[in-house]
Design a protein with these regions (language model features):
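Long terminal segments
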Residues: 3-40, 44-45, 51-53, 61-62, ...
Length: 136
């Protein structure tokens, strides 16, 4: 299981350069670089992902943690997780949406396109689009 989890988490992160985050109309709305720094559409830093799984806001405060495709708040409560097929669930196992491993398309539970994020780790995509860690 650990190998599958690590393979999926890394499946969309083979490049070190910044990857563009896009809305449903394919407009650029931000970037995530290979070091985990998240930037908004005006290139201001709005947070980051640490190597140890911590998710931080623009001021460096911990706002969550990622552990093996599970997402936790700062109190340790699981608020969501991602299946190996890219399905994103909330903490109560309700489907929030989907992340296409093939093309980076992000859709909501009704399969309506909400964005695109190719070349970005799937757990980082979920934190940005579904768990709104960066006010998005």
């Amino acid at each position: 299981m650990m190998v599958v989890v690590l393979a999926l988490a890394g499946a969309m992160s083979t490049q070190v350069s910044a990857q563009v985050l896009r809305d449903a109309a394919f407009n650029s709305i931000g970037r995530i670089n290979g070091n985990g720094v998240v930037r908004d559409g005006t290139m201001h830093s709005i947070g980051s992902f640490d190597a140890d799984g911590k998710v931080r806001d623009a001021k460096g405060n911990a706002i969550g943690v990622i552990k093996e495709l599970e997402i936790f708040d700062t109190e340790g409560t699981r608020i969501g997780y991602i299946n190996t097929d890219g399905t994103v669930h909330d903490g109560e196992s309700n489907i929030l949406g989907y992340i296409s491993i093939n093309d980076g398309k992000v859709t909501d539970a009704e399969k309506k396109t909400i964005g695109f994020a190719r070349g970005v780790r799937v757990d980082w995509i979920a934190c940005y689009y579904f768990f709104h860690f960066f006010g998005k």
